[in-house]
Amino acid sequence: MPTKINGLPAHVLLIHVVIVLIPIAALMLVASAVWPAARAKLGFLTPAVALVALAAVPVTTNAGHWLQDHLRGGAGHQDPAILRHAHLGGQLLPWAIGIFVMAAAVWVLGRRFDLTWRPAPATTEEGTLRRLPVWITAVVAVIAIAVSVGGVVQLVRIGDSGAQAEWSGRTVG
């Protein structure tokens, strides 16, 4: 795992990948889960972006642990703000996994079934996708929205705690 990139701590650079891709993956997931036209247009891109975001989380977290060990006397002498940021950062991986799993599930279900908000017809034509009951589509959408909102909220909490750790007590200007 990289600890420095061009002389800078890797965490401060890699975090931008997570900051950008988690919300994008979450937005794509919600759009795909609730809007069939978006799901058709986005296709495999939604789980692909979610997978890259998921892969970036542990790499960034590990780089953050390295940075934590090298800040202000090592991990044993950290101020509470840095410890809080590290603790919150460790909680993002389950949300990233949830976003990826739901993105993959919505993509697979969308390819195999007609995930629309209309009731299923009594008969289907040969060669058409079988329509799932509306309640299944609704459950998938609710779970997709829940993991997306949870992941973005956790990301904001992590970012805020990191900014507080870095900038508290400092002035600009």
What is each residue range found by the language model?
Residues M1-G173:
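Polytopic transmembrane helical bundles with strong interfacial aromatic enrichment
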